[in-house]
């Protein structure tokens, strides 16, 4: 039985990947940070949204903001793996994209996600 469970586990993980829009993610953190952390922080999920900006942090890591925040200054942020910098370079504001990310909690109610990769 244990062998059967472990064999089916990878397939279940792919099927159970939580899907959310950037707006739903932002609203979840705006409503209740503790509940949103329990749902997203440290977990992989698929997020879809419209690119608002493409940036680099102070360490040169590329990150994207997607529209959907509770206001224009609180758009959710998605840090890409450095190996996907070329992907970030192809993006333009207004493009609709999907990413697979790990939730990183929030900073002042702004949802932060990390280790993001483009959804194939």
Question: What positions do the PLM features span?
Answer:
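OB-fold and OB-like single-stranded nucleic-acid-recognition modules
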Residues: 1-120
């Amino acid at each position: 039985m244990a062998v059967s469970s472990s064999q089916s586990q990878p397939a279940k993980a792919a099927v159970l990947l939580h899907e959310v829009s950037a707006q739903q993610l932002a609203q979840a953190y705006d409503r209740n940070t503790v509940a949103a952390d329990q749902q997203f922080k440290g977990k992989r999920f698929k997020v879809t949204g419209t690119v608002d900006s493409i940036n680099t942090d102070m360490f040169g890591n590329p990150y994207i903001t997607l529209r959907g925040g509770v206001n224009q200054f609180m758009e959710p942020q998605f840090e890409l793996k450095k190996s996907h910098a070329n992907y970030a370079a192809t993006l333009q504001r207004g493009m609709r994209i999907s990413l697979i990310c790990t939730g990183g909690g929030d900073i002042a109610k702004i949802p932060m996600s990390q280790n993001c990769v483009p959804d194939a």
